[in-house]
Amino acid sequence: VQDIVLVGGGGHCKSVIDVIESEAKFNIIGIIDTAENIGKKVLGYEIIGSDDDLAEVFISCKNAVVTVGQIKSSEPRKRLFALLKEIGFYLPAIISPLAYISKHASVGEGTVVMHHALINAGANVGKNCIINTKALVEHDATIGDHCHISTASVVNGGVVVQDETFFGSNATSKEYIVIGESSIIGGGTSVMRSLEKNAFIKA
């Protein structure tokens, strides 16, 4: 069991803690959050510092995961991922034992796959993504870096979701379309055609 530090102490952090505890591969040494929250606890784990303390934390702990959520903008998660890489942290994929990931699929570094998510054969998921509870990534789909595939959403076969896209809860996509980078797909929507980058679709 290796030590790991979590970066971000909000609601998404709680979900990731639950996955890490279920996975039983890592020992959480603490959480990094804003300076005013130092000393507070999240599900019993202490907030031990802010971003400014990460280099010092790295001396004794080499693993980290971004636990800031991603509602619409990917920028906070993207910035923290880059900062952690720059310091030298290893960012393992965190995968719930209750998720199903085909042996013919791939999941990038720093990505978190939540309980009861499914990633089917031939699918490729990029770095620093959230594949949230009960999300389905179908065969041969590609999810870019820094994407959030939200709860109970369906990315159908062969779909390409480009980098930094937010795919909302219970949204679905037609098979074999391309969703351009930095798009926002609102909860409950059906995407039936390819979209240019920075698209915004709402129900």
Place the predicted regions along the sequence by residue.
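Short, solvent-exposed amphipathic alpha-helical segments in soluble enzyme
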Residues: 20-23, 81-83
